[in-house]
Amino acid sequence: MAKGKENRIVITLECTEAKKEGKTVSRYSTTKNKKNTTDRLVLKKYNPNLQRHTLHKEIK
């Protein structure tokens, strides 16, 4: 039998550079495997408000 999907959780990624500049932040939601990736996720994603790729960090 197949194992369940209890290891995958939904997370939210928030732009860090827009927060520093005082602009509107962009947010993405994605999933991660909490057994393989125990620390906070940091990805480079597109921010449409700043019109460039910026760092997005995982928030609670």
UniProtKB/Swiss-Prot annotation:
One of its GO terms (biological process) is translation. The keyword Nucleotidyltransferase does not apply. This is Large ribosomal subunit protein bL33. It comes from Chlorobium luteolum (strain DSM 273 / BCRC 81028 / 2530). Belongs to the bacterial ribosomal protein bL33 family. The keyword Lyase does not apply. The lineage of its organism: Bacteria, Pseudomonadati, Chlorobiota, Chlorobiia, Chlorobiales. GO terms for cellular component: cytoplasm; ribonucleoprotein complex; ribosome. GO terms for molecular function: structural constituent of ribosome. Gene3D superfamilies: Ribosomal protein L33 (2.20.28.120). It comes from the Bacteria.
